[in-house]
């Protein structure tokens, strides 16, 4: 599978993941054919929650003015548009419209196979039906505002969301989730407790997510890599798909 094909799957998975959040939680959504914008009320200054995803570059170019008007109506001054690797024409359009390149995030992909994790003595791998402990692990790194939009999932997982926890002595030490769409598993919210770093627990979570997704019929996993997780994903065999470039519009 080519990098372009995997990036297309990553884009579709990111969009499906956001659409699910909008349907089941507090995210607001603005939609035009081929363009979707998301915003979280009460967190107008947290740019992470104000994001535009697109499938059609021409549609996005034509939507920039009404998109800006919608964000202003929400009281949002800053938002971002992730651009797929190689879409230089769209980047030029955004630059002319006042957007600025702010950061770069690697996209990564991995063909799946059945390789269940080998757990260290005294640890268990669990499949929780709620996200409370996975969110708690993520707050160590992103704070409460980074996962507040997922509060409705804290006590009940929606369909197509599958979580994994590594537990030791009744403590949740690492966890993460996958969002599965078609035969593609998107990997999100993988985190390890600060007390359990350098024990390989993040890799165990990933292998658990991979094996479970494969058993459910997924053939590939995709993700956007944080600096903290990038090395781990490479060790697990993920292939780099190029840099996703976040263009930001700041109107404040």
Give short role names for the model-derived ranges.
Residues 56-131, 247-249:
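Acyl-donor-binding surface of acyltransferase catalytic domains
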Residues 40-50, 102, 179-188, 197:
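A conserved beta-turn-beta hairpin within the catalytic core of GNAT-like acetyltransferases
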Residues 1-72:
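N-terminal charged segments
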Residues 87-101, 203, 227-244:
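Conserved active-site alpha-helix within GNAT-family acetyltransferase domains
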Residues 74-84, 213-225:
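Conserved GNAT acetyl-CoA-binding A-motif
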Residues 145-193:
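A conserved beta-strand-loop-helix scaffold within acyl/acetyltransferase catalytic domains
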Residues 28-34, 92-100, 160-176:
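Conserved beta-hairpin
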Residues 60-69, 189-194, 198-215, 235:
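Conserved acetyl-CoA-binding loop-helix of GNAT-fold acetyltransferases
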């Amino acid at each position: 599978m080519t990098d372009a094909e995997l990036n297309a799957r990553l884009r579709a998975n990111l969009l499906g993941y956001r659409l699910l959040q909008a349907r089941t939680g507090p995210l607001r959504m603005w939609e035009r054919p081929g363009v979707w914008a998301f915003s979280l009320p009460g967190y107008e200054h947290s740019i992470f929650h104000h994001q535009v995803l697109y499938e059609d570059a021409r549609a996005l170019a034509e939507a920039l003015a009404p998109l800006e008007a919608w964000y202003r109506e929400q009281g949002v001054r800053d938002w971002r548009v992730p651009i797929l690797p190689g879409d230089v024409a769209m980047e030029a359009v955004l630059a002319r419209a006042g957007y600025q390149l702010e950061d770069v995030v690697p996209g990564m992909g991995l063909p799946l196979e059945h390789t269940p994790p080998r757990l260290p003595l005294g640890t268990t791998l669990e499949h929780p039906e709620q996200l409370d402990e996975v969110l708690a692990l993520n707050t160590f790194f992103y704070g409460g505002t980074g996962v507040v939009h997922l509060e409705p999932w804290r006590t009940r997982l929606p369909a197509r969301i599958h979580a994994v926890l590594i537990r030791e002595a009744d403590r949740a030490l690492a966890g993460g989730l996958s969002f599965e769409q078609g035969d593609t598993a998107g990997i999100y919210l993988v985190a390890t407790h600060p007390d359990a770093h350098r024990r390989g627990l993040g890799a165990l979570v990933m292998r658990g997510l991979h094996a479970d997704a494969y058993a459910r019929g997924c053939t590939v996993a995709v993700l956007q890599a944080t600096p903290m997780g990038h090395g781990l994903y490479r060790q697990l065999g993920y292939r780099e798909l190029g840099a996703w470039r976040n263009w930001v519009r700041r109107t404040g």
